[in-house]
Every structure is written in C-alpha cells, then in structure tokens.
C-alpha cells in the first residue's frame, strides 16, 4: 500500500497543509510536519471527526446507494369478448447497497484472516439467495399487477367516469403497498448488514469479552425482530388494499345496478301512454273533491292544519316514499304512475313526478332532486323558471369590422340571419345571407335591432410597420438635398426654366410642349445638390400637383410676367399652403416687352403670397429661361430656404419614399419612379408600395443609367414590382419578402372588400336615381395610358364631362399597351378604347377591326377631352325649335260628307305647306294645335301656297272651323345641342 504524506493529502483536498494539520491534531492524530506519513486509519479517524463535527452519527457514516431498474414488456391477453389486446407491463427492481466500514486488523494471525474470508463468502451467498428470492417475488407481483391493470382498463372502458375514481383509489393503495415494500426491503437490508457486521466482528475479535459477543447477538436479534415486524406490516397493508379494492368493486356494482334501474324507470315512463290534459275548471273540481273525500293514504285534513301540512309536505313525502320503496312497493319505485300530468303540475312541491333510486321528491324539477340533492329546496322554483321567457331584451355590444357578411353579423348579434334580412328589407335593401355589408350599413342595422354597435379594430399586419419604423429611429441624421417642386399655370415656362438649369431639352420631348408627367431630376450645382420635381400645369393634373406638393420641401411658383395669376396658379398656392412648405416665386418671361412684374406681385399679394420687400416671407425672383437672367439668384434663394429648414434624414437605414410615377412596360414589366425620402435604397431590397411588392431587380437614375443605390432626396426608377403601384403610394423597404407579400395581400383584400360593399350599398340609390331621371345616355370608355398619373388625370377629366343626360362610364382604366383582352372587354361592353401615349399590338388591332371596335389614340390630354365632349354632344337629344312660316285667314267653311269641314282660306302672309303644323286662333286665342290633313287649290293637291293666293284645307281631327278664324302655320326644326 503506497504511503501518503500530509502535504500530498492536502493537495488532493485542495487545502493548505497547515489547515489539514490542525484538523488532524483536533481528531487526535499526532502529526507535526507536512512530511509525516498518514495511514488509512488516520484518514478514517479524521473522517469520523469531521462527520461528528458536522452533526452526523456513526450510523450515517455508512453510505447507502439505492439502484432502481425498470423493464418494460408486453403481454397479450384475451378479454371477455374474445378480443386479444396488448398490455404494457413495467417491472421495477430496487437494490440497496451499503458500504461497510473498513475492518481494522488487530493481529497478524492467518487463522483470523481465513475465517474472515470464509464468513464474507457465506454472507455473499446468503445475500445472493435473498436477492434471487426478492426478484422472484417482484416478478410475481409485477405479473399480478399487470393482470390487475388489464382488468382495470376493461372496467374503465365500460364506465369511464367511475373508473377515474377507482383508479385514483387503486393508485393510492399501490403507493401504500409499494412504500411498505420499500420500507421492508430497507429494514431487511439494514438487518442483514447489522447481522453480517456482528458476525464479522465476532469472528475477528474472538479474544474480546463475552459481553461484546452478547451485545452483537442482541443487535442481531433486534434486527431480525424489525424484519419480522416490517413483513407483518407489509402483509397487513396488502390485506387492507385487497379489502379496499373489494369495497370499490362492490360500490361500483351497486352504482351500475342503480343506474340500470334508473334507465329502466325512464324507459317505462317513455313507453307509458300519454295522459289527457284536463281543463283548469275540471282540475279544480277534482282537487276540491279530493280535499273533501280524502283517501286511505291522504285523509281529509282540518282547515287549520292545511298551511302547516303544506310547509311540512316537502319533507314528509320523501321520507314516506323512501320507506315504501324500501319495503318493495312498486308504486314508490315508479313515482305514482296512476296520477295525471295536471296532478303533478298542480301538486307542485308535493312529490309528483318520476321517482328513481328511492327518491320520492321528484317535484316539478329534476328527477334526482330530493332529500339527498344539494338543491332540493329550490327545485320547483327552478323548474317553473324554465318556462318563462326573459322579460327584458338582451342588449349586446357588437364590434363591426369594415366589411361583414349578413350571416356573420347575425352570429355576432346571436339572432337568425333571416331577422337581419328582414331588417334590411325594412330599410329598403334586398340582401342575401352571404352578401357583404360595409361598416356603416352594418352599424345602422345593429342599432335598428336594439344593440350597441362599435367599429372594430382590424388585426392589421400594417401595425407591424410602425414598430419596424421605430426600430431605426436611432440612426444618425445627416443633411440631405432639398426636394423642390416647380408648379404653376400651363405654358408659364416651368419646364423651360428647369431645362435651362439642367442644360437639356426636356420641353421638346413633351407632346404639344406641355408637361404631362411628373419629371424628377436631381441637379448638382456649385452650391449643392437640388432635386427638382416638374409637375404639369394643365387643369386635368390636379392630383399630380397635390402629390408633388406632398413630397416636396420647397415650392417654386412659376408665374409668367405677361400673363399674371391664373386658375392653376391659385391651385398651386393652395397645394403649397396645405403641405406647409415655403414658396419661392419665379416671375418668368421678364424679357418680353409686355412683361409687367409689378402687376404679378399685386395679384399674388391678393392670394396671400407676400414678397419679402413688402414684409412677407416669399422671395420674388424675376427670371428668363431664354437669357438665363435671375437663374443664379433663384438657386441661391432655394438653397437659403433649405438651410433654414435644416433638412436631415438617416442614411444607414432601410429606405422610405414616395411613388412619383408608375407605368407598365411591355418588356420590363411594372416600372415605378420613386423619390427616396430617408434611408438608402439598394438593388436587391424588398420594397412594398401600396398593394404592390417585389424585389428591386434593376435601378436607373433619371438619365437611364444603372445605379446600385440611392440616398435621401434622390429620384430613381425601379423594376421588379408585382404590379403597377398607384402614384402617391408610400414605399417601404422590408426585411423579407414573406412579410411584404402578407401586407400586400391584406391591402388588396381590404380594398376589394370595401369597394364591393360600397358598390352593393349604392346599387339601390343608383337605381332610384335612374328611375327618377328617366333614360340616361351612357358613353362607355376604356382608358389605357402610359403612366399611372396620366391615366388617373384623364379618367378624372372625362368623368367631369358627365351631365344629367349623358354619362361617361369608365369601364376599365389601366397602364400599358392595348391588348386583346381590352378589345374583348370593349366588345362585351360596347365601349370605345382611348389610348393615351400607347398603341395596340397587331393582335388587338386585328380583333378590333373584326369586331368593329373604335380605338382612338391621343398624346395631348385636352385633345382627348375635346373629342369625347364632341361625341357626348352628338348623343344629346336635339333641340326642337319652332319657325312661323305663314298666316292664313278662313273666308268660308264647306261641309263635305265623309270628309268633314273644309276651310276656304286666303294666305295673308308667308306661305303654307302641305303637312305643316297649324294653330287655330279664334279671337287671338289658341283653340287647337295640330297638323294639316290636305291642301288643295282648284281641286288639285299642291305642295305649298304662297301669299296672296286662295286655297282649301282641312285639319286633322278638328272640324270646328269657323269663318274669321286665323291659322298660324309653323314648322319644327331640330338643332344639335352642345355641352
């Protein structure tokens, strides 16, 4: 055995040698230096000392290890029905191992060593035998347990509810038995250990005193007595568990028999013949007769005892019936089957009704309400309340979403859908159960039906966008270029001014010299970068100008010095003030001889735009786009305003922006011009614009050159969207395409549902308006344009042309070329196709020619408006005008058989024509207005008779012609009307 020093032991224990020496000396081990050798006995003494100092006894010094082993197997067992089922069997084995103390040897004799080994071998054999017996016993008990569990599962399938309680009780019994078995095993192991220790010590210490052997024998006897006691406790626990299981089985059997008896009683009641209802008068007579005569079971009671009997009747009747049922009376079991339903109802609390399981107080309430019931006192009152309808209506709080179907609305109010349909019919609208209602209509219906309506908040995925936007609020804010919008009246020189700044010829490319798109450009000057937005000045582009003002920081208001303030100038001022942006006024065309800048200033002051020289805030700069006069001053004022505004935006953040313009290219697909307002837009980003989403596949600047990224205030053209977005939509960069698709689909569905609901709600109003107005001419149109903004402006301009007689109907409006589907739609709706800066492909042209569809092409918006206006004028009913062409005097009247009155007349003025319209005037009063039937001169039919000649004539459906009457001859001409 290797020797160990104090220093080595201290190193193993991670302690200092000095502290270990102190503990050894306290334990009674004489060690002075770290180099002293320490033996196993010294270690044992030190360990015993430490255990005693920590509060542990010698008995606890022994280490006990409990090993639990589980084995799961399957057995197949046939049940009573012959079916074979598989039962999971789990066998648990538990072993307790105790580490015994090291035996100190007090002698060197070989006899004691051999005897110790022999004794140890004998003890091991005894322990192995006992372990085998314990395993066999555990195996038998596991098999019995598996059989019991199979039987219990079969019982649980029949009566699941009862089995839950039985399983709980059985589990408790098994826990008790298992606990007792564990205690017995622990006691057995402790006894074996004690006996073995005593035997070893007895063999080793033969020289010891007889008193010690007697003490060891006594300890062994005590341990054996403990084992016997544990076994007895185990047997008693097992007997108690068997007894409890038997009692549970008996209780379950009793409950099953009682339930079967109850079911038989219910079946007998259902099979009994129906009883005849009696009138209240007959019932009262019978009750009165019964009170007078009485029976053997219910004798006549004195009047004074009636009230007391009624009070005690509820308690007395159950007791009496229970006694009768216990005696075996069939009437008690069936609950008075000979009585009538009226008797049961009239008796109320007197015990009438079905009686089951020995309960005689069925009453009017439930079958089991009786003396053992928890609510027997209130059963009759509860039963009667079941037949009473609620007196007050239930008012519900209904949360109405933006769109809801009739069926869902009825479900929210807990009424039938037919009730909602009836209410809608009362309100004058015919709906079906699946029809979608808008929020306003649905809330009116809810209020009409007596409930409270609230506008529900949608589970909107767009709410996540706000959170995402806040996450990047800590990005560094850097200066950004100003966004300047050039606004003004048409032909006042906006594009020419911008052209001079950019040194390019933009105006020459616009049709008719007018701007019809928003042009976005950024210009690098010596003083910094400026982004310009050139908006149209034509009146049709109101929405475009509003979008330009929304996205801008500064507005350059262009006013021609020779023209002054015009309608679109006033509109531009209103847009700028609504957006809250500063205005810089550029007075153009000052190089013309007829220019009058002072008049322009006075007119702008009247529009609340006051120049700085008058004490206002708006700088006025006279400029000329031809000579370049004042251009530098204009840029200087713009940059000065930008410095005052301190324009800043985050650069290292997801981009946000605005759709300035959008179009559909046949080869590239949807294209959108975007003005980045904050962040940096990069190629490959996932963008969301309204209901359109996609990944940026390509990005071009305003000159058509590819660009990898765009910072704040930089306009770019992107490709890769799923559809053409609406101009003016906000553009966001999202982290993944799945989220963008989810929000885009939600917006599409929301827009579609709201639009459909509003259309359905307006159908009745539209129908009534058409009935009131009579027949209205309709001009159906299909509008296709190159960009979204032009299509929007053209549609709005055409819809403004509608009148009470002719209405413009926009069947479809879109972006891109004219396709065959557009021609098919025009064929079905009999519409005219208008192409604005687009053309039809070969297939569409051939199909349109075959179907006779008219396709008109325009590149100037007011040309399209003028032609549609002329077409609408042709659809107007012509105006009828009267023209007097002659005067005729009746000189003589002739009566001709089968013809009637024929007037001999003199044409005094003008002429008279056959089939002309005439008015008969007598004493200058019109008495008839009609048409000539015939016109003759000397018995010959003539076409006309001029002034100074005589003629004979007759008037249709008028014979009361007298001498002296005046005939006024006139004709009606149709004159084409204009809008």
Swiss-Prot record:
Region G5: start-end pairs: 624-626
Ranges annotated as biased composition (Polar residues): 78-87
Biased composition (Low complexity): 174-192, 317-327
Region feature (Disordered): 50-385
GO molecular function: GTP binding; GTPase activity; guanosine tetraphosphate binding; translation initiation factor activity
Region (G2): 513-517
tr-type G domain ranges (all copies): 479-646
Binding-site residues for GTP, renumbered to this chain: 488-495, 534-538, 588-591
Biased composition (Basic and acidic residues): 50-77, 98-109, 121-142, 149-173, 196-211, 219-263, 280-291
Principal localisation: cytoplasm
GO terms under cellular component: cytosol
Intracellular or extracellular location(s): Cytoplasm
Keywords: Cytoplasm, GTP-binding, Initiation factor, Nucleotide-binding, Protein biosynthesis
Short name of one Pfam family: EF-G_D2
Domain of life: Bacteria
Family of the protein in this entry: Belongs to the TRAFAC class translation factor GTPase superfamily. Classic translation factor GTPase family. IF-2 subfamily.
Annotated function: One of the essential components for the initiation of protein synthesis. Protects formylmethionyl-tRNA from spontaneous hydrolysis and promotes its binding to the 30S ribosomal subunits. Also involved in the hydrolysis of GTP during the formation of the 70S ribosomal complex.
Protein name, per record: Translation initiation factor IF-2
Organism, as annotated: Cupriavidus metallidurans (strain ATCC 43123 / DSM 2839 / NBRC 102507 / CH34) (Ralstonia metallidurans)
Gene of this entry: infB
